[in-house]
Amino acid sequence: MKTMTQLNIAVVVVVTVLIGMLRSSEAQLQMNFYAKSCPNAEKIISDHIQNHIHNGPSLAAPLIRMHFHDCFVRGCDGSVLINSTSGNAERDAPPNLTLRGFGFVERIKALLEKVCPKTVSCADIIALTARDAVVATGGPSWSVPTGRRDGRISNKTEATNNIPPPTSNFTTLQRLFKNQGLNLKDLVLLSGAHTIGVSHCSSMNTRLYNFSTTVKQDPSLDSQYAANLKANKCKSLNDNSTILEMDPGSSRSFDLSYYRLVLKRRGLFQSDSALTTNSATLKVINDLVNGSEKKFFKAFAKSMEKMGRVKVKTGSAGVIRTRCSVAGS
């Protein structure tokens, strides 16, 4: 009798495990996840991008940056979009204070809610808009499997601790990327998104005027480039508003020129310069520069798809928010 009871318990355990495994496999991200529940979802997003990105081409960079910042905090769950009246949400953290595109994503969400209420997650909207925005700038496309669910927790401190700041050295970059399951090649390739977009002198002034107690100017910065910035752009330590192109002369084209600038010590951020301080990442950069744009596009797309899978919530985990900015919607 005891043996039979033990056998029955063992069978129950095995069946429970198998059911759990089955549910887990069913809950994974998949291509065309909304094919039945909201068949036009991806077209609605793509059309909105195409209809608006040409009037505001500078929006492509913020949308891909938003995807990056979302995935690095609690996974790709749309929590970066949540508003907080107490100022404690992810978007209140220093790395996100200059983040743009919140209203753009909210408008797409409103369009989808009219057609398919409570169906398409904010997390999926971020992932799809990032891809479609890059394509609109002439960059690569990549597969975006969908089925992400939205998180309801958005924490300022977690964002501060997990999003790599522009002042990061190589050790910090490696650690923060590793925490998300991303390797050194991913680090270099995802940094390639700096080929589009702009920043401000606030992100550069310390490198130009107040780098350390012993050195005023960052020695890793090309001296001619620094002199040009001081003369024509960031004319004082207090200039926080002047716009700087991430990839001067090519900031609206998705290409390899960012890596060429990094090799010339003309990357805007300390984190850009940090990529050349490690032999492994330096080799990846040189291989990219000496290769074709097609090869770069393919590799970048692979890393973007990999990042888009970081710690996603699927199946019964998470929720589908009706308003991306409201945690309890």
UniProtKB/Swiss-Prot annotation:
One of its GO terms (cellular component) is plasmodesma. Residues 141-165 are annotated as: Disordered. Glycans are attached at N83, N155, N169, N210, N240, N290. Induction: By high salinity stress. Its cofactor is heme b; Ca(2+). CDD domains: secretory_peroxidase (cd00693). It comes from the Eukaryota. Residues 1-27 form the signal peptide. Residues 156-165 have a biased composition (Polar residues). It is an enzyme of class 1 (oxidoreductase). Binds 1 heme b (iron(II)-protoporphyrin IX) group per subunit. It catalyses: 2 a phenolic donor + H2O2 = 2 a phenolic radical donor + 2 H2O. The record marks R65 as: Transition state stabilizer. Heme b binds at H194. Removal of H(2)O(2), oxidation of toxic reductants, biosynthesis and degradation of lignin, suberization, auxin catabolism, response to environmental stresses such as wounding, pathogen attack and oxidative stress. These functions might be dependent on each isozyme/isoform in each plant tissue. Belongs to the peroxidase family. Classical plant (class III) peroxidase subfamily. This is Peroxidase 30. It comes from Arabidopsis thaliana (Mouse-ear cress). The lineage of its organism: Eukaryota, Viridiplantae, Streptophyta, Embryophyta, Tracheophyta.
